[in-house]
Amino acid sequence: MLDILRERFASNSNRHGDVAWEEVEVALAQQPVALDSLTAMEETGGEPDVIGRDQITGEILICDCARESPAKRRSLCYDDEALRKRKRNPPRGSALAQAEQMGVSLLSEDEYRYLQTLGEFDLKSSSWIIAPSEIRSLGGALFCERRYGRTFVFHNGADSYYSTRGWRGILRLPA
């Protein structure tokens, strides 16, 4: 996995900001379980890559950079609460549970918008993002996509799922 990440890092220098590859290697060596998360991201079609550094915490950010929402992470409702409430035709799982199992988080709206400054993602798909508690408490959830050169944020019932909607993950590595 380290070789794949190194190659992707070298091929997409516009994504990394001020993060040097040596910093990524040191951070991964100090947190070896992160390689398991990166492997899961890669195996489900995420194509993880370094997208910079958190300006507050200094953490190195590694995010799914596949052009479309990862194929093996689609047709999922938002969370397990929505999954339990869906009686007819339930999906095979939920985005939040899958992310937790992989050791990553869904992107926030701000993180998703930042990702879109690094390239054009989700031109034919959409991705669940973290829903604020005030929306989730009413049964809703949020997803994003890029169309017409713009990033859009939409709402839907948390129990909804579509073959074109998945989720993107982000992994934070202490620097």
Q: What are the language-model segments listed below?
A:
Residues 1-105, 109-175:
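A binding-site-centric feature that preferentially detects glycan-recognition modules on secreted/surface proteins
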